[in-house]
């Protein structure tokens, strides 16, 4: 039996992505997100328009998409309620965010030089995708509650770096899905490719109702 429902969020489960970008002063920003999907060598990323990451991407035209494995929940959690925006936007203050100019250090992760773009890769992530911005699309423009608040950014993957540990034995251009265990975000909780929750996410402390447009 089904019932009509109106959840505040529709995060049914997608891979966590750590997006690295370059700030105005040349330092690095690193932000976790999970509103992402791929088709061919393109990826579409969903952001709040006033977040630091999309602002950096639009300004520089570059980013790196770093995909953590399921054993990296600790590092991702340490980033979960941080922002590179100073001052912190009111909407993020309401959710418990704080300004952090040293995201790599906070997460305990290592910045590694990229080959095709300026933002660094995350050395610990098994998948590292250097990318450039192709187009920016506002979302929900017809909804006065969301007008100007959401963006979909299409990026083109320029360089793919993969850990040898997740590659197929007979083909270095193919990932073995039996070896790759992505970290999944589902309704603000961390999961892997197993039925059980891996650990609690700090984002789960935020009431889902705070994500409704007001």
Give each language-model segment a name.
Residues 1-214:
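Basic, polyanion-binding surface patches
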């Amino acid at each position: 039996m089904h019932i009509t429902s109106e959840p505040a969020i529709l995060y049914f489960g997608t891979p966590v992505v750590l997006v690295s970008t370059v700030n105005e002063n040349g330092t690095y920003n690193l932000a976790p997100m999970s509103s992402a999907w791929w088709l061919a060598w393109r990826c579409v990323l969903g952001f709040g328009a006033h977040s630091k990451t999309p602002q950096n991407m639009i300004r520089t035209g570059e980013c790196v998409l770093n995909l953590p494995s399921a054993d990296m929940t600790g590092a991702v959690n340490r980033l979960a309620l941080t922002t590179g925006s100073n001052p912190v936007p009111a909407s993020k203050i309401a959710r418990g965010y704080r300004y952090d100019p040293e995201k790599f250090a906070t997460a305990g992760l290592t910045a590694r030089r990229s080959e095709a773009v300026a933002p660094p890769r995350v050395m610990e992530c098994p998948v590292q995708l250097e990318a450039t911005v192709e187009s920016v699309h506002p979302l929900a423009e017809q909804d006065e509650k969301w007008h100007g608040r959401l963006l979909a950014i299409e990026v083109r993957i320029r360089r793919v770096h993969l850990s040898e540990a997740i590659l197929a034995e007979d083909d270095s251009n193919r990932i073995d899905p039996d070896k790759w265990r992505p970290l999944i975000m589902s309704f603000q909780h961390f999961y892997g490719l197993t039925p059980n929750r891996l650990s609690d996410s700090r984002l789960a402390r935020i009431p889902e109702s705070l994500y409704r447009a007001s």
